[in-house]
Amino acid sequence: VRQRNGLDGYIMETGFRERQGTSPHYNRIMRFAPRPGYFQADPAINRGRSPAISNDSRTWPDSWPDRQNDSADPGWKGNWNGYFGKRPAADQESFFVMDDQFYDAWNYNSDFRDSTRRGLGLRVEARGFQWANPQAGNVIFWHYDIVNEGTTDYDDNIIFGVYMDAGVGG
């Protein structure tokens, strides 16, 4: 990306535990972080501080931010925010939304409408699907919707990759 000082910056957004940088502006670890409103933030209700899981309504927010415009049921209070509607598409679903707001080590704004927006201006909606069927046992299927919320067009220089590690054994 071209920074405000005219120099090129190379933003690689990583999310593994080790060797993550600290944001100079927010003084937080630079990684995708959960967006508020998509899980129950009250630890007295969501004791495990879990992301929203379809089979545990204690993890759900009071209402879903992305469903506020439903004129018949604004926010879908008390309902699961499923991929195909108010019910899970699998035996169990998880759902979380995150963004790259804390990637602020570069003199760069991805959105000219918002001078406080940092990172590449990306929002990621992630949904995990699990089934009890033996053919799909021990597997989580992940679906990612990645949205550029900023005003910067990245043309052909963005790559998406996922590294998964269950951390078994340490």
Features from the language model and the residues they span:
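A long-range scaffold signal marking pre-active-site subdomains of enzyme folds
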Residues: 1-170
